[in-house]
């Protein structure tokens, strides 16, 4: 049971429910193939049925960790830090990103955009979900839009979301892993017919790395 005092610090963003942190190769989207240090923050109520990290949903199962400790670990490994979840924007990201930027680190976020954007970000990957749509200014600020394709209806959703981002935003369609054999040919066909889109694959799963 987390005390009220600790929970206050979490709500302020001074501590965060840390699920895991690891140094690996970015497997998805624009920066795939590059080394980065990942910080996975617990807590998410978006509830995607195909989520591959459902253990991240309940923030109370992950230890509240000071952002100073998180930053000190991150700086040992990489100049590029990716904050993911869970849904990191559940929490105030300003204290963490201020700490990372003070050490001259590049800050990237992977988010559904379901909560207002906080933090100082060099790269924003917006991956919107139907059951809890993005809010606020994140559409204008996203550098890449990554839509997960589980069935043919997701192509319609992808176009609806693409209409809301800036012209400079890079557009990706990514197969949901469990249906990849069926859905990849559909994505390939769609991208060939609509070349503003690119294909994103979870290459880290093919490489068998985190």
Features from the language model and the residues they span:
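A short beta-strand-turn-helix
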Residues: 26-29
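A generic structural micro-feature
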Residues: 31-33, 139
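Conserved AdoMet/S-adenosylmethionine-binding subsite of the radical SAM
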Residues: 71, 89-210
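Radical SAM enzyme core and accessory elements
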Residues: 1-13
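Conserved Radical SAM active-site core
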Residues: 3, 16-23, 35-38, 42-121
